[in-house]
Amino acid sequence: MALKHYKNSDSTVFNDAKALFDLNKNILLKGPTGSGKTKLAETLSEVVDTPMHQVNCSVDLDTESLLGFKTIKTNAEGQQEIVFLDGPVIKAMKEGHILYIDEINMAKPETLPVLNGVLDYRRQITNPYTGEVIKAVPGFNVIAAINEGYVGTLPMNEALKNRFVVIHVDYIDGDILKNVIKEQSLLQDDKQIEQIIKFNEDLRTMSKQGQISEEAASIRALLDLCDLITVMPVERAIKRTIIDKLEDEREQQAIYNAVELNF
């Protein structure tokens, strides 16, 4: 199935990402949750025809999750031997692929310094488990994504941040958003789509004012909502896709108020 490409009314977002990629710069995509950062990375991967290896960061991320680990394997002679299975970082370096580090500021600060040599001019790393020195082959690039201010995130270490060039990725809107809804959801009714876009604009405003979380206004939640509207009333669809995900009753009530104003 063909990849649904990233779209944005600001063409400089993708064009600059492509230019930085061509210059072999580390790219840091910075923006609210659900704004399309991963979709942008996937689109870039397809456009340059280079596979992408993804790391999903969390507080549980460790060096083995990045680099790989030792395991026991039975060889052709039936004997057991210890082998090292490459992780996403080493795979991407050896194969000249893209390394995508999602939500990089969710990782514990002490986990990431192992990547310093990967991210600077050296483009190499010494595998602490095997002693092998791996130097990235041509084609290797690094893209990372960050959700600033999101629950559970930590400020990025300045030494790490300085290894990236930043591109801000904001939510899409207007005709671009309308086209994305038609292409990526089941909802095709123009009048309903216009209502949903207006509702989403209200959610984004509330999110910027701190009344609700960013996830409630995300494109992911919006597309889920559009799908559900085709099989149930809009109010119930909003409850299933947005309201019931929220723990704070004040956030829930703020969205109920927005529903009353828009539908």
Swiss-Prot record:
Classification via InterPro entries: ATPase_dyneun-rel_AAA, CbbQ/NirQ/NorQ/GpvN, CbbQ_C, ClpA/B, P-loop_NTPase
GO MF terms, alphabetically ordered: ATP binding; ATP hydrolysis activity
Positions bound to ATP: 31-38
Record flagged with keyword Nucleotide-binding: yes
Any Pfam family the entry gives: CbbQ_C
Keyword entries, A-Z: ATP-binding, Nucleotide-binding
Family: Belongs to the CbbQ/NirQ/NorQ/GpvN family.
Protein's name in the database: Uncharacterized protein SAB1265c
Phylogenetic lineage: Bacteria, Bacillati, Bacillota, Bacilli, Bacillales
